[in-house]
Amino acid sequence: LWRLDPRTGKRFRFELPTTVVQRFTLSEGRVPRVVFFGQTGTTSRNAYVADLTSSRPKCTPFGEVSFAKALGDVQVASCTPWSYRRSDRDTVPGFYFLPADFDATKKYPMLVYYYGGCVPTTRELEFHYPLSVLANMGYVVLALEPSGAIGYGEEFAARHINTWGKRSADDIIEATKAFMDAHPYVDRKKVGCMGASYGGFMTEYLQTRTDLFAAAISHAGISNIASYWGGGYWGHTYGETAQYGSYPWNNPELYVKQSALFNADKIHTPLLLLHGTADTNVPTNESQQLFTALRILGRPVSYIQIEGANHVVTDYGQRVKWQQTIMAWFAKYLQGDAAWWKGLGFKD
């Protein structure tokens, strides 16, 4: 939460007990106050009221509004900031979760998550992908903010333009290896990755670049930049920024070289493709055509459609099964337990 003085242009950041601020409202009284929802990677949402006359305001829980009470005595995974200095001395920020019953003498499979769209992953317990829950299922969970993510300055975000994953993939691969080197409790042979939308594209593209991962999940991913450019709710509009000045007819190399579909023969990692049948952002064909290619090649791939779902799965019942599907896929390939996957009615 920041304050901006419109007269001087000066700004400063308030020091709050939360890492995420959600849905705030300001008072209009003589003493400036704010009421906001906030949370961290280890605490659930709570409502706070804060006096903004100080840069370190006292934040008081507001009344009896506390989602955290629903957790009771449930132990949550720990959440720790972590960053990696690339070989070119640039920094890749991130954080990681460890199970509540973590034992450093044991080996753990690891999941790597990166942005959906180019929106950075925030340190919050109630995230769209339940990273803390996954950690407590026996994983180390590493969340990275690779090049192209917004929130780290204009230059950092602009690295996404006309690269379509190249620099971001370098960030993810280098950072994942560096994390494993620094944390010997990670089982290097049991590392999975996942992302959605542009993050789904990254999942697919990464498998054409490395054999680092033992399992991968792409939700609503883009497999063919050319077909996405001309379809979907905003493919062309997005492309006007993401590949500014580059079109299939004047820069075909970008569209082919960076698309997983045209490099499908390089993919050997077991890959799960998830897609809502009513996705207006990324058409379902983006998953269908990669699934077809990998099946022709005889590679381990599964494709599951969520009936009637748009770009994000919002129906409660579908969302529960969607989450279970993700968990079951990783349990099958990273924990050696296929019972959950089979129990959901899916075939190999």
Where would I find each of the regions flagged by the language model?
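The conserved beta1-alpha1 loop
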Residues: 114-116, 275
